[in-house]
């Protein structure tokens, strides 16, 4: 996946505004189950929010780890919520069009 440009990130952040977090990071932190949940959510939705219940001080680092493990990209971090994006591997099934 190509690196997102600033305007593309802004567009995706606006698309994510109305979304609710689909995955929450709890006391166990980043586990294989968490990575699997994020991966499945990205496959189904392409653009998701991940809420930090714990590890709030490490949210930037943890978001990067999750993005690397799921081959996605961190669109932004707002408060205790990270926005992740990964386009669908099949172009005809992509739900989100980015400029």
Give residue ranges: language-model regions.
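Positively charged, polar, low-complexity stretches
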Residues: 1-99
